């Protein structure tokens, strides 16, 4: 859980370097950061890190409803092995929810619960940064020779 919070804080810091004014909330809040967009519009941000790539990004309906109740710009940031995706939820026509088995929210159990979720297509994201495969650099052959 501690590493996850460090990753969330890193996303907040990177967005702040790009003109945002966000503060990490942490804890049991319904969102991970609160603040302002670069245009000074109040916002809340939910951040998810996924270890596996899927072409659709899952957002629990409950989480979506809690974000929308804040009456601020609601944002959903997803990082997975293929890239980073930022969804501006207020502007989206949400698909019909689908019941999916999701981890229980308590930390001391491994059971899964059936929860209604939205599956957001990557094309619905406003900002997409795709990760690139690492390519050999100019110094790689030199350092490979040094290892032998």
Describe the residue ranges of each PLM region.
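Short acidic/glycine-enriched loop/turn segments that link adjacent beta-strands
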Residues: 27-30, 83-84
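Arginine/glycine-rich "motif VI" loop of SF2 helicases in the C-terminal RecA-like domain
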Residues: 67-71
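A structural signal for short, well-ordered beta-strand segments and their strand-loop junctions
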Residues: 24, 44, 75-79
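A general structural detector for well-ordered alpha-helical segments in enzyme core domains, enriched
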Residues: 11, 63-66
